[in-house]
């Protein structure tokens, strides 16, 4: 803690009495007058006699939560603060979590309005891995910024530019296949979904790391706006469809963290980026679309387009013989109905890896919930004139049938993860599952 920083005494309620025993009498009187009990989410500013701030008391959960101090960044007066030594934050991991929560609570998306007042700042606590905190925070900010940006400023072109900027920063190789070149290079499904839009469809590819390290492929759905296509959405359903590229945003956020932390992996990032638009060239219901894998898809619903573009991207990912494929996508409302808006669904075909991700998510307070790849539902995605359909009839098990669809295109004998989540929360875009996956990858492969 620096001399200029205002101390924050973060305390669980059962530690408050012991702390007060060593506090000056005027502080004890102030705490009593305000009936401060150190309940989670509460705080008390302790004044100096000269009118400044002597310190802040902040209540902690038991066990300590990442989010315990997150609101303080915007509720405390501007200035620099530091965690004072207390029993609850003596553990470096707990202090690190509190610092990350503080930074995440500082986030504001003000690209289109006057800048918000500068939030209060927290100096890194002693023993904290500041590089890891900063990498995770920047990764999450990146996801939030990308998802919050409206579609008129975040189409396939701009999404590719964001990926290119990340590649340049970390000396990763970058390639993009655009428009009719998708047909020339055998990505017909991506082309079919995106060809109706003015901003041409594309496949974004980024590669980073040592080829001698295990290959990890990240695949993210990049539907930059989803009108539903000819099976058009309602006004309510369409309103927040700028967030339908949340899977791509998550992949770029994870890639940023992986590269910043120098994980010992050979990273492959693939993002099929399209707008699902309406025009005379739009994909029609009951069209049959070919894929890079040679599997034919019957378009049961043009609003189930995300899995169609992911089919080509997953096939491409498998061509690099990865050890792990991780696929992030906002595929179905069914997952939201089943699990709500704060708990992403995890589909995984390997029990060991699924458990590793679930444990990492619990430890990082970034929980996921595993859903079954129930083989009995495969018949629900059988096509009538094509091999499979992108929209199972009947309306049942929508999240599972979407995952089973993607499983057809995942490389064989490779452990494949698929996360179906809702990246947009009421306050805007959010990174869900990112910290869990970064932690699981770091645990599995280590840092250079």
Predicted regions and their residues:
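Short amphipathic alpha-helical segment within the helicase RecA-like ATPase core
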Residues: 1-222
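A generic structural signal for tightly packed, nonpolar segments enriched in small/aliphatic residues
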Residues: 160-448
């Amino acid at each position: 803690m620096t001399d200029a920083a205002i101390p924050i005494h973060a305390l669980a309620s059962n530690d408050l009495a012991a702390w007060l025993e060593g506090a000056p009498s005027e502080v004890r009187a102030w705490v009593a007058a305000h009936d401060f009990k150190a309940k989670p989410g509460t705080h008390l500013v302790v004044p100096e006699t000269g009118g400044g701030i002597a310190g802040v008391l902040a209540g902690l959960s038991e066990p300590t939560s990442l989010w315990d101090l997150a609101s303080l960044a915007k509720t405390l007066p501007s200035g620099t603060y530091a965690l004072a030594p207390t029993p609850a934050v003596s553990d470096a991991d707990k202090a690190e979590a509190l610092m990350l929560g503080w930074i995440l609570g500082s986030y504001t998306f003000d690209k289109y309005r006057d800048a918000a007042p500068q939030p209060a700042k927290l100096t890194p606590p002693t023993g904290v891995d500041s590089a890891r905190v900063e990498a995770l925070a920047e990764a999450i900010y990146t996801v939030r910024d990308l998802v919050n940006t409206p579609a008129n400023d975040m189409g396939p072109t701009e999404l590719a530019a964001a990926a290119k900027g990340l590649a340049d920063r970390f000396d990763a190789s970058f390639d993009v296949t655009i428009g009719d070149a998708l047909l020339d290079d055998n990505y017909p499904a991506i082309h079919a979904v995106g060809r109706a839009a003015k901003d041409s469809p594309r496949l974004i590819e980024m590669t980073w790391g040592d080829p001698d390290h295990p290959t990890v492929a990240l695949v993210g759905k990049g539907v930059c706006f989803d009108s539903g296509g000819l099976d058009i959405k309602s006004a309510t359903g369409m309103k927040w469809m700028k967030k339908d590229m949340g899977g791509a945003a998550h992949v770029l956020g994870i890639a940023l963290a992986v590269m910043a932390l120098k994980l010992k992996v050979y990273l492959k990032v693939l993002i099929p980026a399209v707008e699902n638009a309406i025009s005379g060239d739009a994909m029609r219901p009951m069209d049959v679309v070919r894929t890079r894998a040679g599997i034919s898809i019957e378009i049961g619903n043009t609003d189930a387009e995300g899995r169609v573009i992911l089919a080509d991207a997953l096939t491409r990912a498998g061509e690099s013989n990865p050890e792990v494929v991780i696929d992030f996508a906002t595929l179905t409302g069914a997952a939201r109905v089943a699990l709500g808006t704060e708990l992403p669904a995890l589909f995984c075909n390997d029990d060991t890896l699924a458990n590793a991700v679930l444990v990492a998510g619990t430890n990082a307070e970034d929980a996921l919930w595993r859903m079954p790849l129930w083989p009995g539902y495969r018949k629900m995605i059988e096509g009538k004139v094509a091999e499979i359909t992108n929209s199972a009839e009947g309306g049942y098990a929508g999240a599972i049938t979407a995952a089973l669809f993607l499983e057809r295109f995942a490389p064989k004998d490779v452990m494949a993860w698929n996360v179906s989540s809702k990246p947009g929360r009421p306050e805007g875009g959010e990174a869900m599952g990112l910290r869990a996956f970064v932690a699981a990858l770091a645990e599995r492969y280590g840092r250079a």
